[in-house]
Swiss-Prot record:
Residues 348-382 form the ShKT domain. One of its GO terms (cellular component) is extracellular region. It comes from Caenorhabditis elegans. GO terms for biological process: nematode pharyngeal pumping; nematode pharynx development; proteolysis. It holds the Pfam family Astacin. Residues 19-79 form a propeptide. Residues 1-18 form the signal peptide. The keyword Nucleotide-binding does not apply. This is Zinc metalloproteinase nas-7. GO terms for molecular function: metalloendopeptidase activity; zinc ion binding. SMART domains: ShKT (SM00254), ZnMc (SM00235). Its main location: secreted. Binds 1 zinc ion per subunit. It is found in: Secreted.
Amino acid sequence: MLLPWIITIVTVIPATLGHRNRVQDDEMLVISDSTDSLNLEDFEFADKLTREELFGKHIPVEVVNDFKSDIRLPRRHKRNGVSRAAKLWPNARIPYAISPHYSPHERALLAKAVKQYHEKTCIRFVPRQTGEPDYLFIGKVDGCFSEVGRTSGVQVLSLDNGCMEYATIIHEMMHVVGFYHEHERWDRDNFIDIIWQNIDRGALDQFGKVDLSKTSYYGQPYDYKSILHYDSLAFSKNGFPTMLPKVKSATIGNARDFSDVDISKINRMYNCPVEKSVTAPFARARHVPIYSPQYHKYEDRPKIPLRSFDMQQGPINPPMAQIPSQSLVVSSSSGRVNYNSNKPSSQCEDRITVCWWTADRCRSPAIYQVMSSLCPKTCKFC
């Protein structure tokens, strides 16, 4: 009796996969000689997009990508920031070509994002000229992903069907310009808590840090409002938070456009001729609930005042947010997050640099003693 069902499954699934593969194959054929670009009609359509069309339902990049990173690195390359001139786009000029598989509405979304870069920064997305070897190809390749900064030859920015949303396009293009995610900053532990126990094991490497010696934040403070900041549930294996801001009234990961700090960093990276002074708040004014799995209800975070910092300070002495005294206590059984008002011990440091790899097993009886000795900070033992 099961045979007919088996036959149905075998005949239906390959057809679906075959369609997806054909689209991908078509894109790969187009990449090599594409010169198609946005036109005046696309930009006119972009100006007519409604707020709902621009800022409607947002699907996190990691969900679209099935919990894979949206940053793709060349083989053998380590994760590092962009501070060397060779990784920047010369003269802030990004030659590009786009896939013919985008609909008029999708082309309008791309045009809107490009227009924002042109209006707020000196970055210029320019149509690729025939025979130009180094350029950005924007197409429906496989999910949402980009390399960081400029690479040689044809560079792919994949914006597939699930990625065609304004905020996602702005986010991915900022990777193209040269920036990693905000939560990967070397100083992130001063501003967010990583809840390792709640992170999907296959995504632990998404919470590494960018090497300070190989990146620059151009004197800008940690930015909770950055378009490049993931949300509190990013890569969660159990629906509970994977990272939380130390400023308890702040929210992360719900940006729908550039923050002021995003724009400031881009303009400083590319030495844009005009840059306005920016004051960046370190906390959101909104009152945001945190889900508590133990009580199955929402518990509100208490409000605290906003703090602002002058963005004119130089890169040698970057402005820093006041580091709150609260520390996090995480239940090993449920993933529940609570705040502890006591200051963490100044001696609370990991003794090795790879604690993240086994952070989801901190309280496993087999390695508990080793983890408590080598990784007390990551495991929240102190």
